[in-house]
Design a protein with these regions (language model features):
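Cap/lid segment of the alpha/beta-hydrolase catalytic domain
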Residues: 116-195, 234-250
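Glycine-rich nucleophile elbow surrounding the catalytic serine of serine-hydrolase chemistry
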Residues: 208-218
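Bacterial Sec-dependent signal peptides at the C-terminal "C-region" and cleavage site
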Residues: 12-30
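Mobile cap/lid helix-loop segments that gate and shape the active-site cleft of serine hydrolases
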Residues: 225-271, 278-291, 297-303
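Alpha/beta-hydrolase-fold serine-hydrolase catalytic core, especially in secreted/extracellular enzymes
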Residues: 26-105, 115, 121, 269, ...
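Loop/turn elements at helix/coil->beta-strand transitions in domains of secreted/extracellular proteins
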Residues: 122-124, 153-156, 200-203, 224-228, ...
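Alpha/beta-hydrolase fold nucleophile elbow
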Residues: 198-210
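Bacterial N-terminal signal peptides that target proteins for export
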Residues: 2-13
Length: 387
């Protein structure tokens, strides 16, 4: 199983390289249409009541497009946890959440050490999805650094894999319903995080870059439990599916409502949001073409102070140190923990083999489903309430 996972990861890494190369090239074909739509939507939605109605429409049409309408009930679920490790100021466990019958969302749970967590009975919780970064996704050192640092600051952090990446190998990342699977995984990951006894469900945040930023946008739009969100290097004039990975645009979640990425960010108002853009990817002109629209939605709630734009004109498409620092500061202010710089000497970078939930020594449960057809059947069973 380990060999298969490594080979699959290598194939995905190669595909991700091509995806990012395409992502960073010229203007998208739908850019002008998106800008026209924003002008129309802005003229039609000038107060909070109008935005409340629009958000309801966006949620409904997104869920319909993803095959999740009406939103299925999220009942009890099983959680597998193993391989507890303790480091300097934080701990790590390998965790799998059964999100569908026999289908698992895999990840790592980072927690502050009890001595730190004891300062408050409950602390913030933060979801950290990863993007299409070569190689390794959530196993990448910079992703581990982000999660470990936030845990050292007192947050409980759940880092989880995209479908078809790392140890999430029950179907492929180009599965026709991968967008629905990842959205459902995010909802269940949020359920899991909020259920933990040391997490204050009123202080839950989410951040990710690129495809992880898309997941952040989608979940923050759909679920008010995400109290503060920070999508990184992803908000610019685009609408699915042209130019997107299937996990972002493989299902019609934007078309029926004639919406786009920038409107999704605006519809998160009035909850706190940081949108981070850079000069060397398609977000390069977000401060000019996107942020005024997003800010207008927040102003409709008299909450302009709750949305921030950080633009780094000399930086590229990643989640590097300066981007992480901006996100740490934003989350600290809005979720209530102390903001300090990273101290890399206090963070242990683990090997992927340590972080895998499923491996030769920890195999998938016998009831696990395998392949797109079986996963699709499990998805349909969940939707119909079957067991």
């Amino acid at each position: 199983m380990r060999v298969r996972a490594l080979r699959a990861s290598a194939r995905i890494a190669g595909a991700a390289t091509l995806l990012l190369a395409a992502f960073a090239t010229g203007p998208r074909a739908d850019r002008e249409q998106v800008l026209q739509d924003l002008a129309r939507i802005g003229a039609e939605h000038r107060d909070s009541t109008a935005w409340d109605r629009r958000r309801s429409v966006l949620r409904r049409e997104f869920l319909k497009g993803a095959g999740l309408w009406p939103l299925p009930k999220r009942g009890p679920y099983s959680v597998l946890r193993h391989s507890f490790r303790q480091y300097d100021g934080y701990t790590v466990e390998n965790v799998a959440i059964e999100t569908l019958p026999g289908f698992y969302c895999t990840g790592n749970l980072y927690r502050p050490l009890p001595a730190l967590a004891a300062a408050k009975t409950r602390g913030p919780g933060i979801l950290c999805p990863h993007g299409h970064f070569k190689p390794l996704g959530r196993f990448r050192p910079e992703h581990q650094i982000r999660c470990a640092h936030l845990a050292q600051r007192g947050a409980t952090v759940f880092s989880y894999s995209m479908v078809g990446w790392q140890d999430s190998m029950q179907t492929t990342h180009d599965d026709p319903i991968v967008l629905a699977l990842q959205t459902w995984n995010s909802l269940k990951a949020l359920d899991f995080l909020c259920s933990l006894p040391d997490v204050d469900s009123e202080r839950v945040g989410m951040t990710g870059a690129s495809g992880g930023g898309t997941q952040t946008l989608y979940l923050a739009l759909l679920d008010d439990r995400v109290k503060a969100s920070a999508p990184v290097v992803i908000v610019y004039p685009w609408s699915a599916p042209e130019g997107c990975c299937r996990c972002e645009g493989g299902m019609p979640v934007m078309q029926a409502a004639a919406t786009n990425c920038i409107e999704f960010a605006a519809a998160i108002a009035p909850r706190p949001q940081l949108i981070l853009s850079v000069g060397q990817d398609p977000t390069h002109d977000f401060p000019e073409v996107g942020f005024p629209f997003v800010r207008s939605a927040y102003d409709a709630y008299r909450a302009g102070h709750c949305v921030e734009s950080v633009h780094l004109p000399k930086e590229a498409h990643d989640f590097g140190p300066s981007k992480r620092a901006a996100v740490y500061s934003f989350l600290a202010r809005n979720l209530g923990f102390e903001d300090r710089p990273e101290n890399l000497s206090r963070i242990t970078i683990e090997q992927p083999s340590q972080m895998e939930v499923f491996s030769a020594s920890h195999p998938l449960p016998s009831k696990a489903v395998h392949g797109p057809a079986a996963v699709s059947h499990a998805f349909a069973a969940m939707r119909s309430g079957q067991k």
